[in-house]
Amino acid sequence: MGKFFLIAFLIVSSGLIWGSGPARRWTAEVEGGAVFSGYNDARIPNVGGTLFSLSEDLDITAKAYYRLRISYALSRRHELSLLYAPLTLKAAGRLPAAVNFTGVLFPKDTAVDGTYTFNSYRLTYRYRLVDKPRLRLDVGFTAKIRDAEIALEAPSLSASKTNVGFVPLLHLRLVWDWTAKLGLYLEADAAAAKQGRAEDVLLALNWWLSPQTQLRFGYRFVEGGADVDEVYNFAWIHYIAAGLAFVF
C-alpha cells in the first residue's frame, strides 16, 4: 500500500507541474526531518500479557522520516487531500524483566530487537470556515487507515502483533499570516473514544518563498493508542519537521 501511495503521488505531482492550468487548484506537500519516541507502552494481549516499554525498557533510535500530501481545491471553500505517512522505529536492549508478548515468553535479561510500525494513509475533506487575507481556518473530517505492528525478536524467539484498521478523525487547519512572508501554520487530526484516542498535530512557522511556494519549520507530535481486550498500546512520537508546499 505504501508503494502505491508513493507512486501515485509522484505521478500526480509530475502531471501537475507540466500540465497545470491557471486555476492553481492543486497543492503538493513534502515533509521530512527527525523522529524520535517519547513513551511507548504495550501489553499484548491486554489481559494476560506483560506491560513493557519500547522506549524505557529498550532504546529506540531516532531516525529520518518523510510524509507526502497531495490536495485538490474543489472550489474556494472545499478541498480534498491524500496523505501518505509511513513510520517505523527500531528498538534494542535487554529486557529488565520477563515479558509475555502475544503468548511468547521472553525471559528476563534477554537481548531483543523491537520494531514499532505505524503507517498512516488518510483522505481529508476540508471546509474553509474563515477566509480572510491573513487568516484562514479550515475544518473537516479525515478517514484514516492505520497499518500498525509491534514486534519483538530474540536469537531464538520472535513474536509480533499487526493491526490494520479504519479510524475517523476530526480535522483542523489554521494559517495565520503575520506579514506578507511569515506566519503561523497549525494542522491537526484528532479523535477520542472509550477504546482509545489519536492526535496528530503540527505547529510550524510558515515562510512564503513565493505566492506559490511555502517553507515550513516546526514541531509535530503523534500521540494516542488503544485500550481494548486484544491490545494495550499508547505512544507519544515527536517530530522535528521541515516541509515544502507547492501550489499549482
Regions found by a protein language model. Name each.
Residues 133, 164-166, 189-200:
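Solvent-exposed loop/turn segments connecting transmembrane beta-strands
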Residues 197-247:
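Predominantly the C-terminal beta-signal and adjacent terminal strand-loop region
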Residues 30-32, 68-72, 123-127, 141-143, ...:
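Residues on the lipid-exposed face of transmembrane beta-strands in outer-membrane beta-barrel proteins
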Residues 181-196, 221-222:
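Transmembrane beta-strand segments that form the barrel wall of outer-membrane beta-barrel proteins
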Residues 25-27, 63-67, 118-122, 165-169, ...:
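Transmembrane beta-barrel architecture of outer-membrane proteins
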Residues 20-87, 247:
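Short glycine/proline- and aromatic-enriched beta-strand/turn motifs that initiate or cap beta-hairpins
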